[in-house]
Amino acid sequence: GFRSPCPPFC
């Protein structure tokens, strides 16, 4: 699965 780095991408 892919998780967007947060922050900056939420």
From Swiss-Prot:
Tissue expr: Expressed by the venom duct.
GO cellular component, one term: extracellular region
GO molecular function: acetylcholine receptor inhibitor activity; toxin activity
Keyword Disulfide bond: yes
Provenance organism: Conus zonatus (Zoned cone)
Protein name stated in the entry: Conotoxin Czon1107
Organism superkingdom: Eukaryota
Modification type Cysteine amide: residues: 10
Chain's role: Inhibits the human alpha-3-beta-4/CHRNA3-CHRNB4 (IC(50)=15.7 uM) and alpha-7/CHRNA7 (IC(50)=77.2 uM) nicotinic acetylcholine receptor (nAChR). Incomplete inhibition of responses is observed for both subtypes, indicating a potential non-competitive mode of action.
Subcellular location: Secreted
Consequence recorded when altering residue 1 to A: No change in inhibitory activity on human alpha-3-beta-4 nAChR
